[in-house]
């Protein structure tokens, strides 16, 4: 399963904060299966998940956010804003401590936030099993342990143009297959 954690990054060029918005459970985990506690890439933010009882790191990932990019703009010197950010983590089997850290370009901590997630918490929303957005597989090369899915969104198409969208999406898949 997957734990979706929704945060709101807020602030301006002088001061930043992180707030927890919502937790959701999704039916399957399609992320990496090995080296979960190692950082695959350096970003300007990190999420660290630790077993609550042992404090051992069980998952770590990095990211770069639009909020941190926005902080470098002139607008951020004059006004504060909030940006929504969602992260997908392996669903914990035991209670965990989740820490999220935002870094400056000089790798100084700008903001951090810690919270505990208990897997049996009734406030964690179960999603992805009902009210699933209609979708079609245009090309399916294997299961999520072997392959990744690429989503093609119908942005810009009207409801009446869905047949055209699916035709264009199929053409894009065929073009991609010929490149591989």
Model segments located where?
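Fold-level signature of zinc-dependent metallopeptidase catalytic domains
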Residues: 123-180
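Beta-strand-enriched, solvent-exposed domains that form extended recognition/catalytic surfaces
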Residues: 1-124
């Amino acid at each position: 399963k997957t734990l979706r954690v929704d945060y709101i990054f807020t602030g301006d060029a002088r001061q930043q904060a992180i707030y927890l918005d919502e937790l959701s459970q999704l039916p399957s985990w399609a992320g990496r299966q090995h080296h979960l506690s190692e950082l695959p890439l350096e970003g300007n933010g990190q999420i660290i998940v630790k077993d609550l009882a042992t404090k051992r790191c069980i998952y770590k990932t990095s990211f770069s956010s639009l909020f941190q990019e926005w902080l470098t703009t002139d607008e951020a010197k004059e006004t504060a804003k909030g940006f929504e950010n969602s992260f997908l983590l392996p669903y914990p089997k035991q209670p965990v401590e989740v820490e999220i850290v935002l870094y400056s370009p000089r790798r100084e901590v700008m903001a951090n936030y810690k919270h505990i997630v208990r897997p049996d918490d009734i406030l964690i929303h179960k999603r992805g099993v009902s009210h699933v957005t209609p979708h079609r597989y245009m090309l399916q090369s294997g299961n999520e342990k072997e392959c990744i899915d690429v989503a093609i969104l119908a942005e810009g198409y009207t409801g009446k143009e869905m047949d055209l969208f699916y035709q264009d999406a199929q053409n894009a898949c065929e073009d991609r297959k010929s490149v591989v």
